[in-house]
Amino acid sequence: MAQLFFRYGAMNSGKTIEILKVAHNYEEQDKSVIILTSGLDNRDGVGYVASRIGLKREATPVFDDTNIFEIVKQTNPDAACVLIDEAQFLKKHHVLELADIVDELKIPVMTFGLKNDFRNELFEGSKYLLLYADKIEEMKTICWFCRKKAIMNLRFHDGQPVYEGEQVQIGGNEAYYPVCRHHYFYPPKLTK
C-alpha cells in the first residue's frame, strides 16, 4: 500500500544519506526510483543530492512552479518509489501533488527534510507534510555542543548565533549547527 512518508531531523541527521541508501536498495532489485530535490539547494550544483560523506547523484530539481505529479506521471508512472530531498522547501501545492501521487498513481513517496528553521518556525513544506503525511518519523542526531539529542538548527555568522533574518540561506556546516534546546538558547561562542 502506497503511503506518504515524512522523515525529518535537524542538520547532520543523515537525511540525504538515507535517500541514497533507499534508492540503492530499490535499484539493486531492478526497481526504478525518481529522486527530486529543491532547486534552491545549489551547494553541489542544482539538480543533485549530495551527502556530507561525499556521496552524490543526480536528481530532478523542484522549483516553486514545478508540478511534481506531472513530472512523475510523464517520467515514470511505474516507478517503485519517489524520493524527495530538502522537503522543507516544498510549497503547499507540492505536498498536495505528492499526496496525489500516492493516492492516484499508487506510488510510495518518501520525503526528507528539516522540520523547523533557525528561528524555530516551521518551513512551509514541513508544515504541510506534518498535516498530510501518512507516516512521520524523526531522524535523530546529537547536539554539536553536548551529548543531548539535537532538535533545533542554529545559524551562526562570524562565530555569533543568529536568531533573525531570511528563512532560506543555503549552507552546510559553516552556517548551521544541530543543537539541543539548551544550546539553542545558550550557545557557546564559536572559535572556528
Swiss-Prot record:
Q: Which SUPFAM superfamilies match?
A: Glucocorticoid receptor-like (DNA-binding domain), P-loop containing nucleoside triphosphate hydrolases
Record-listed Zn(2+) binding positions: 143, 146, 180, 183
Please provide, in alphabetical order, the Gene Ontology terms of the cellular component aspect for this entry.
cytosol
Q: EC number(s) in its UniProt entry?
A: 2.7.1.21
Organism's domain of life? Bacteria
Which reactions fall under this protein's catalytic activity? Answer: thymidine + ATP = dTMP + ADP + H(+)
UniProt entry keywords in alphabetical sequence:
ATP-binding, Cytoplasm, DNA synthesis, Kinase, Metal-binding, Nucleotide-binding, Transferase, Zinc
Q: Which InterPro entries match?
A: P-loop_NTPase, Thymidine_kinase, Thymidine_kinase_CS
Q: Gene3D superfamilies given for it?
A: 3.30.60.20, P-loop containing nucleotide triphosphate hydrolases
Active-site annotation: 86
- The UniProt record lists the keyword Kinase: yes
Under the subunit heading, UniProt states: Homotetramer.
Membership in a protein family = Belongs to the thymidine kinase family.
Under which name does UniProt file this protein? Answer: Thymidine kinase
Q: Which gene encodes it?
A: tdk
